[in-house]
Amino acid sequence: PTSHGVPSCGWLVQQHAMPGKFDRVRADELELNAKERALLARGEDVIGEDGSALEARWFRGGERAAVSVLFSGDTAAQPPEWKPSVSPTLLIHEATFLSEQQEKADEHMHSTATGAVASALSVNASVLALTHYSNRIKSSNQSEQEATAVDTDLPVLALNDNDRLVVDDDGTVTHLRWEKEGWTPTSIEPNR
């Protein structure tokens, strides 16, 4: 839930933790047949043709962490109802105003860029993406500068129309910004 004067909502999209990748090279080295590979890939231990035991865990890399994106709609900073079941990899949060318009933000139940940082810290987000700016803000860089001025190691980026975000399985966020020459990618490592 969000905290706003009119109906508004947010969404949490989550990919749960996944098993590590299957080690095909090791399976090739041991000359495993298709049935043995399939059983091991499903997590089942196998007794080889020679009677040796093969444990499925020997053929998997480390578990890939859960990845999640929390999208806020219009909201005041730090809605008391926010209690996500996981710390989001990426929080996409409105930053309608700058801190100099805090009273207006409070009056209309919107956030400032620093309020968005407070929201991100309250849910332990790894990366914060700002969006939804008032027309009083001439450049999204103003919001980004205000947010990054807060003394924290939280990576912050400011979104503009037509930007794209890609969240990889390892939690790396790639910000794609369209420029005259094409898409310009910027990778942001999570703060975890």
Predicted regions and their residues:
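Active-site-proximal loop/helix segment associated with metal-binding centers of metalloenzymes
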Residues: P1-F71, T75-P84, L90-I92
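Binuclear metal-ion centers of metallo-dependent hydrolases, dominated by the metallo-beta-lactamase
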Residues: A77-R192
